[in-house]
Amino acid sequence: MSYKELSEIFMFLANDEFSTSKGNKILSMSQAKRINAIMLTCGFYDESGEFAFRVGLPGKSGVGGGIIAIHPDKYCIAVWSPKLNEQSNSYKGMLFLEKFTTRTASSIF
């Protein structure tokens, strides 16, 4: 699976209808809100607060170096870089997302 495909899969958490690209409704607004809140507060293990502060989006990291981040009602972005930091999150992935949300002024805060 490519990271383009991964970001497309997670778009249901970013679009305002909480549905697939084919229009199949997956979640209620309440469910999507809860999932995004959990991702914002828990998606990066012990570094979740730092990710929220630096990037400002709900997200989830994987030990393979992947990160998925969601801007509700706007977009979903996936990045990958295998070098992990001390908290087992992608070092360059987090750095890229921080720069991206700063330059585009697209943090949720």
Report residues per predicted region.
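Structured C-terminal helix/loop/strand segments within mature extracytoplasmic catalytic/sensor domains
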Residues: F12-F109
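A small/polar active-site loop signature that marks catalytic segments
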Residues: M1-F10
